[in-house]
Regions:
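Short, conserved phosphate-binding/catalytic loop or strand-edge motifs used
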Residues: 24-28
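Short glycine-rich or small-residue beta-strand-to-loop segments that form or flank ligand, phosphate
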Residues: 29-33
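C-terminal accessory/tail domains of diverse enzymes
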Residues: 1-22, 35-190
Length: 191
């Protein structure tokens, strides 16, 4: 029901002339509650993202400029440190998150540099949410003027919730990238 209300807000914004798409350097950031997550499930989520983010970027046709700056792939230093140390506490997970990316100096600052990743755990430690920064609305076409799309937003939210649930239910997850010879097949079999 919350998604229905959010979709209606998007429709109202679109009709009022609001604009959002990658050409305007606008991304769609989805925050989901971190409730029920543990350091282990957050490590699972990290590994799930690391193994599928290239596939997601291709399937979603993400803007390369955004990937290079505002929604980077999982930091390899973080990934290696996380899977080596396997923290058992949230504070231990936070230490790995910030220290592995050399962003330990301003953990409580809103614009901490660690936040600019597709999967952002800075939001977890400052807001209690897990943020997915990888989405964007499609550029306007076919007579549409602004790119906002309620159905697209709904599918983004549902994907984030599914990834979160997958991480909670998995006994473990590998960071090894999935095959990408046939991206459409890989995406279908994964989801």
């Amino acid at each position: 029901e919350d998604i229905d209300a959010l979709q209606e807000i998007i429709r109202i914004l679109r009709k009022a002339g609001a604009k959002s798409d990658a050409s305007r350097m606008c991304g769609v950031h989805i925050h989901i509650g971190a409730n029920g997550h543990t350091p282990k499930t957050m490590r699972n989520l990290t590994n799930i993202m690391a193994s599928h983010e290239g596939l997601l970027a291709e399937a979603l046709e993400l803007d390369r400029n955004r990937i290079g700056r505002y929604c980077k792939m999982v930091d390899p230093r973080f990934l290696a440190s996380l899977n080596k140390k396997k923290p058992s506490t949230m504070s231990g997970f936070a230490d790995v998150w910030y220290k592995s990316q050399n962003e330990d100096y301003a953990r409580s600052h809103h614009y901490n540099g660690s936040r600019y990743h597709m999967l952002n755990f800075h939001a977890t430690f400052t807001k209690g949410t897990i943020e997915f920064r990888l989405f964007q609305f499609d550029a306007p076409k076919d007579g549409k003027q602004n790119g906002l799309h309620a159905g697209q937003l709904k599918s983004y939210i549902q994907l984030c919730l599914a990834l979160s649930q997958m991480a909670k239910e998995a006994k473990g997850a590998s960071p090894k990238p999935q095959q990408n010879e046939n991206p459409k097949y890989a995406m279908r079999t994964w989801l």
